[in-house]
From Swiss-Prot:
It comes from the Bacteria. InterPro entries: ACP_PD (IPR007431), ACP_phosphodiesterase_gpbac (IPR023491). It comes from Klebsiella pneumoniae (strain 342). Keywords: Fatty acid biosynthesis, Fatty acid metabolism, Hydrolase, Lipid biosynthesis, Lipid metabolism. This is Acyl carrier protein phosphodiesterase. GO terms for biological process: fatty acid biosynthetic process.
Length: 193
């Protein structure tokens, strides 16, 4: 899962949106560094990552990547799940339009930025102003995201080429998303994540 899915599941679970979004920027044990609700959100994010990586649908989707891009498939898929969530937001969350949810999330997260890791603060400078969460609907933006990650981390250069795998298997990936994401939503609503 990437930013949008983590925020969505956190919202459904009444968990900390800042903690869930910040988790990838916090290493090790966060105890003592953040308020309890942020820590709970960090741990929820980590549980979701482990659960998602071990889902049969996600493991199968990884196998659809070519050998030269399979190593980065987990990262590429995380971004792609956000694409499908953004694409189908109105169906999955009919009572809360995506633009309203994004405004709500921003209002929850921006106030905690002064006490946040610098890399997380940097992310937030772009996430909201460039409307990333809404733009995940656009496959051109997904390609830009993958290229940006590859540019910042040379060992992830294969992310550039993983775009081709997404294009080749788009319909199958969308099917996989529908097989697992509604279940994740139910788990979140039942506080089981």
């Amino acid at each position: 899962m990437n930013f949008l899915a983590h925020l969505h599941l956190a919202h459904l679970a009444d968990s900390s949106l800042p903690g869930n979004l910040m988790a990838d920027f916090v290493r090790g044990n966060p105890q003592g560094d953040y308020p309890a609700e942020i820590i709970d959100g960090i741990y929820m994010h980590r549980r979701i990552d482990v659960m998602t990586d071990n889902l049969a649908e996600v493991k199968e989707a990884r196998e659809w990547f070519r050998p030269q891009t399979r190593r980065v498939a987990p990262i590429t898929l995380d971004v792609m799940w956000d694409h499908f969530l953004s694409q189908h937001w109105a169906q999955l969350s009919p009572d809360l339009p995506l633009d309203e949810f994004v405004r709500y999330a921003e209002q929850q997260i921006v106030p905690i930025l002064p006490d946040s890791p610098p890399r997380f603060v940097n992310l937030n400078q772009y996430l909201w102003s460039e409307r990333w969460l809404e733009r995940y609907q656009e496959m051109d933006f997904i390609q830009r995201v993958l290229n940006g990650m590859a540019s910042r981390r040379p060992r992830l250069d294969a992310l550039r080429d993983s775009w081709q795998d997404l294009d080749t298997h788009y319909d199958q990936l969308e099917g996989q998303f529908w097989r697992f994401y509604p279940q994740m939503m139910r788990l979140a609503e039942n506080k089981q994540l």
